[in-house]
């Protein structure tokens, strides 16, 4: 339709044509909300069906990214591809790393897989991390407790869409 946003409509440096519109809009908005006084790179972690990581230089050029199964996707795959595991009914992630209860073990394992990739990819000395997406608060609040270089902005993509239309 005439109001459809296409990747090529978004003005970002080094933006590949195949890049998802949602990721591009998140980048666009992240560059607006960050006042980059230390000229740090920007790492955007969009926690949804997938966890998409996108890294930009301090000047706003896309370096690249990673895409991994998201929180619910990992839980659902355990339920679908194993015989005796069911997705937990609540998502209260235990603070202990090793737990006896199966549902809590699944939650802790998925949480550790997602935060582990963040910890491997995010260097607070060189990066500012912006966390967005539907599961951003579930995971982001635990990460933020450890670092000031983290911004949680759950609706980053939607805000990017609004910014794009308001031009």
Regions found by a protein language model. Give the residues of each.
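Gly/Ser/Thr-rich loops at beta-strand to alpha-helix junctions
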Residues: 49-52, 136-137
